[in-house]
Amino acid sequence: MYVFNRGDCDQTGYGIGLKNKVVVLSQNALSKEHFGQLFFCTGGNGANPNPMGRTVFLISLSDGEACRSERGEVIGTVKPELLPEEAKLQLSQIRPAGAADLHTHEPEYSGYSFLEDGRYAAGVWLGSPQEVMDYVEMQKPYQHRVLICDRDDFAVMEVLKGQVIFPTEKELEAFQKSMQEQKGGGMEMK
């Protein structure tokens, strides 16, 4: 297994934010339960730039299990082009931090992230337009293609190589503006 180091990171140090990024943990920090060094950071008071706290909350890209670690055990954020395909597939299954509980909220969208060869893992349910935007932002740097579909499986958003190709930029800006004005009230992505 490849051992990631500081040279594999695009950002290192305490001056960077870790939330919604793939981070590399020091090999010394790994427990027997988590054999890979790559984790998706969901938050914690140690995830902020120049943090006051030390705790970071993570999801393993080896097995999908949630865990916590200390900020000092994080080497940095991995360069997106170095993220292995297996880790990309695992990342595609992570819902955004703060996503609505699917036991009490009806999902409105499904998100799919594709590798360059077209492979993907099962889609993830997304409960609101804000969850869609959060999912796209967290996947965009790492995935070849991200596709968002509505409940009828019609494509409502597509991102290719980090660029939104559907809807147009103008339509997306109008949608985001209306979302800000309504703050969670009934806007439909088309």
What are these regions (language model features)?
Residues 115-118, 123-149:
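A short, charged, amphipathic alpha-helix used as a generic interaction element across diverse proteins
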Residues 1-28, 98:
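Mixed-charge, Lys/Arg-rich low-complexity intrinsically disordered regions
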